Structures are given as structure tokens and as C-alpha cells.
Design a protein with these regions (language model features):
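Helix-centric, low-specificity signal for extended rod-like, repetitive segments
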Residues: 1, 34-37, 41, 50-53, ...
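Residues at secondary-structure transition points
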Residues: 9, 38-45, 49, 101, ...
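Periplasmic/extracellular, small/polar-rich flexible segments of pilin-like filament-forming proteins
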Residues: 2, 60-140
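Short, charged low-complexity linear motifs
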Residues: 15-25, 44-53, 77
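Membrane-proximal N-terminal amphipathic helix
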Residues: 40-67
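N-terminal single-pass transmembrane signal-anchor helix
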Residues: 7-35
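N-terminal secretory signal peptides that target proteins for export/translocation
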Residues: 1-7
Length: 140
């Protein structure tokens, strides 16, 4: 009897375990949406940076050739003609393309794909005049 009394308080009761699991589940339910928002914001930043890089490459090409180009692989140094998967083919969240190009201007866009397609900012667009457009005004 003495041994049973000694070991009776060494474990957790089922109620204590259930309360702990409930607290962890509530914390996870609150934290997960916030985490996903942060992930989407990070992907948006990657898309904007890719568009700015494309605009920079177009400006460099224009300064050398006095015309803009739509040839992403030949003239701008990308691996393929487009669309370019952003950030890469294994983690594909945006498609980078030149949607319009002439001797005097260009328009490029980063369109969301896959899990990023539900993002409220939608497609990012930039042109040779550095006009930046997105679905919401606070996205750029």
C-alpha cells in the first residue's frame, strides 16, 4: 500500500493531457493563418524583385541597342524564352512574362500561380516608365 501511494502522483491524468492538447490546438489554429500570410508576403516580395530585375535588364538592353526587347532568353539572359517560373521551377508561385514590347516601351508582369493564385494582390505589372500596378494599391 505504501508503494502505491508513492507512485500514484508520478503521471498525468487523462484530463490534464486533453487540456494540454486543446491548448496546443487553439494556439496552432491562431498561429497558422498568420504564418500563411507571412509566407504569401514573402512570395510577393520575390515576385516584385523579379519584375524589378527584368525592368533593369530591359533598361540595360535599351541603353545599348536603343530599343526594347521581348526575347527574354536571347537578349535579357534568362534561361528560357518565358514564362519564367518565380522563384524557380521547384517552388513555382509566379510566372514572369513580357506581355508587350516595342521599340519605345515594354510591359512585364508577374502572374500568381498555384497556391499563390488566391492572393489578393493578384498580378504585378511594371513598364518602361516604371509604372507599377497591382490589384490593390498597397501591394507595391
Amino acid at each position: 500500500m505504501n508503494i502505491q501511494a508513492k507512485y500514484r502522483h508520478l503521471g498525468f491524468t487523462l484530463i490534464e493531457l486533453l487540456i494540454t492538447v486543446l491548448i496546443v490546438a487553439i494556439l496552432a489554429a491562431v498561429a497558422y493563418p498568420s504564418y500563411m500570410d507571412s509566407v504569401q508576403k514573402s512570395r510577393r516580395t520575390t515576385a516584385r524583385n523579379a519584375l524589378l530585375d527584368l525592368a533593369s535588364r530591359e533598361a540595360k538592353f535599351y541603353s545599348t541597342n536603343n530599343t526594347f526587347t521581348s526575347s527574354m532568353n536571347t537578349d535579357l539572359g534568362y534561361a528560357s524564352a518565358g514564362p519564367i517560373a518565380i522563384p524557380d521551377a521547384t517552388s513555382h508561385y509566379y510566372d514572369l512574362t513580357i506581355t508587350a514590347s516595342s521599340a519605345t516601351g515594354f510591359t512585364a508582369q508577374a502572374a500568381p500561380v498555384g497556391p499563390q493564385a488566391t492572393d489578393g494582390c493578384g498580378t504585378y505589372t511594371i513598364d518602361n516608365l516604371n509604372s507599377k500596378v497591382a490589384a490593390q494599391s498597397n501591394c507595391w
